[in-house]
């Protein structure tokens, strides 16, 4: 069974259209490390993007490899500085 992580990014007002193309580039890089996006939604009321990512195997090790990768570093070049906050947590299925 895959491990699932929930992520919520709070974006500066009016900047979601700037952030989403950058976020999609990072998702492409994560997928190269075996991650899969379970869902992703924009909460327009709170200007958040809420998403879940899963990985089979050792999530923490794969995430560390991804975070320290040259692919991720390259994707971060020119990143818009529009995130106000991040919340991250591991998920447990209830239904």
Task: Explain the meaning of each model-derived region.
Residues 2-18, 33:
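Surface-exposed interaction/gating patches
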Residues 1, 6-7, 47-60:
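Accessory recognition modules or surfaces
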Residues 92-93:
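Specificity-determining recognition surfaces
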Residues 18-42, 54-89:
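An amphipathic, aromatic/His-enriched active-site/gating alpha helix that lines ligand/cofactor pockets
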């Amino acid at each position: 069974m895959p491990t699932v992580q929930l992520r919520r990014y709070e974006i500066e007002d009016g900047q979601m259209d700037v952030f989403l193309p950058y976020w999609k580039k990072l998702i492409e890089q994560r997928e190269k490390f075996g991650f899969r996006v379970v869902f992703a939604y924009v909460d327009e009321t709170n200007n958040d993007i809420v998403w879940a990512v899963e990985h089979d195997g050792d999530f923490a090790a794969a995430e560390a490899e991804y975070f320290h990768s040259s692919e991720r570093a390259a994707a971060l070049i020119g990143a818009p500085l529009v995130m106000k906050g991040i919340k991250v947590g591991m998920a447990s299925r209830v239904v």
